[in-house]
Structures are given as C-alpha cells and as structure tokens.
Amino acid sequence: MIFKQLFEPESSTYTYLIGCRDTGRAVLIDPVRETIDRDLAALRELDLTLQYTLETHIHADHITSAARLRSLTGCKVAYPEMDGLACADVAVSEISPLDVGGVRLQPLFTPGHTDAHHAYLVDIPGAPHIFTGD
C-alpha cells in the first residue's frame, strides 16, 4: 500500500492518498478544492491513476474537489450511502466496501461529527490503518 497524508492549512483538514503498488490505482479521501493541483501532482509523482474520491461525510468546513477531480481524471466519486447524494457514482456502507486495486477500504459507520459520518479501515496485516476524517 502507498500512503500519503496531505494537510490543507486554511481549513485545517487532511486529505489521504492511498494507492495500490500492484495496480497503480489510487483513492483520495476527503480531497479539498483549494489543493487540487497539489493532489494531482502527488498522483503524478507516485505514478498513480485516481480511481475514486471518497468522502467521510458532507463537509461544512471546506468544499470538496471530488466533482472537479472526476471531470479531470475520470475517477468515480464515492460517498456514504446514507448521505443519499445523487451526484455520487458509488455509495459505500458497512456492507459495501471499496476496493482500490488490491487495497480494500472497509466503511465503518461512526456517527457523531455528522449523523452519517463514516471512517474507513484498511486492514493491512500487522499494520491496520483507520481514516476518520476531520
């Protein structure tokens, strides 16, 4: 697995880039509009193709770059199914994990920050990672 944590200082939010070394496919979790050029540069630098953007929740503190990334790269936009967004290409839930090449992201319903908030578990043997958003 390829992993990169990216920080956006204006909104104090993190974007996570996760990639599969074997397939060259990647996902950006919680991408931010103001940092789209940085994110695209990171994908190029790592020789990755963006397969998905994935949100932990609908954000009030920043604007997602998901739609713009979809138009630039052809990636699919994934959101928690409970959000019921018509603009999402893929709906994820605890029973619908997201596979990015050989990397599986398991959605975990974690209400609190928002009513439909989800975290994502990448269960790498010996080194599990969980991405919680904000």
Report residues per predicted region.
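Active-site HxH/HxHxD metal-binding segment of metal-dependent hydrolases
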Residues: S12, R33-F109, P128
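Conserved beta-strand hairpin/beta-sheet module of binuclear metal-dependent hydrolase folds
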Residues: M1-L48, Y120-G133
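Generic secondary-structure microfeatures
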Residues: G102, T114, V122-I124
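Active-site-flanking alpha-helical
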Residues: T64-S65, H118-Y120
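Divalent metal-coordination and catalytic microenvironments
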Residues: I18, D30, H57, L69, ...
